[in-house]
């Protein structure tokens, strides 16, 4: 699983997962994982499994306004991407209005979405650089 960043569209919606500007770092805290996200970016979730195994992922998003969104289960493969929340206008993006993601597959984990400054303070790691469209994945094969 990876969290692929991109510049947040002003509309707050995308038709499909945009080109990735790179994976966001994830750090472990005492009880959860931390995901740094600035106000000008959003992310989609990349999914993969190894060795021909199939996995079912259950995902719950908890927003800062108190709203909770439970997704239908996602079977990997064939699914490779969770672009956002389907809402009839495409996908509402995962952005800084998201507080938590709860992920359940073989085990459960919670991912807390925090600002870059808070991420650096809580982890001692450098905050990621601001998103830059010059770093967009162009479709070439990776090694």
Where do the PLM segments sit?
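Intrinsically disordered, low-complexity segments enriched in small/polar residues
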Residues: 1-143
